[in-house]
Amino acid sequence: MSVQQRFRFSGLRITRGALIVAGLELGLSLVWLLADLATRAQLSQWLEATPANVFEHGRVWTLATGVFLERDFIALILHITVLWMFVPTLERFWGTNRFYRFVAITSLVGTLAGCTFGLLIGALNVPISGLNPFIYASIVAFGIVYARQPVQFFGVLPLTGRQLMYGFLAFLALFVVATKAWENGVAFGAAMLAAAIMTSKRWSPGLAWKRWRIARARARLKVMSGGKGHVPPARDEHKWLN
């Protein structure tokens, strides 16, 4: 990142990657929310991830485009708030490239799991859209990485990162049960599980791969005989006496 770019983002709490993700969802969602019913139907048909769109019509690209289409304005505000307050901390810790991988993997896993479950129960037209899977996955990641970090929730409620994670999980469970949004619940759960695997030191695939390579390298190492090199024989002092 150039000096000019660093100066540009230094005055903002949000980081570049989080800002781009927020801008994509905000732009596409506002287009949908401000459009008429006919335009909404067209946008949903070609951009929104549903079991019917993905599995019946073969519009697999909606697994990616649907991530940035949020129908609920309140949920959209929540997404922007989380992207502004908590997600930049993760991006600074990971770096932008790893942050993008986290967004892609958790969003894809969550959306695909939700659509698959919707197909199994016959809810073919239930949308699995928006950044919800990634948002809740980022809360889980924050609770794991910054488990003991003090957090002022909205500047009022003092919590630790782990307590914040448990609070969101409890709220999410109540929401899914109260609304019976089982498809979205599966999507959220799959994304959060992916986040836990990616951020946990015990279950992280990247760390497991590194540990396997280190163990393999150690198995191939041979113990070389140590000690001194060639030692010249001791001088016969009596022989050289004058």
What do these predicted regions represent?
Residues 146-168:
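Membrane-helix boundary/juxtamembrane motif in polytopic membrane proteins
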Residues 124-147, 159-161:
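Membrane-interface micro-motifs in multi-pass membrane enzymes
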Residues 11-128, 179-183, 187:
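N-terminal TM1-TM2 helical hairpin plus the immediately adjacent luminal interfacial "cap"
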Residues 122-126, 149-156, 203-216:
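A cytosolic-side transmembrane-helix exit/cap motif
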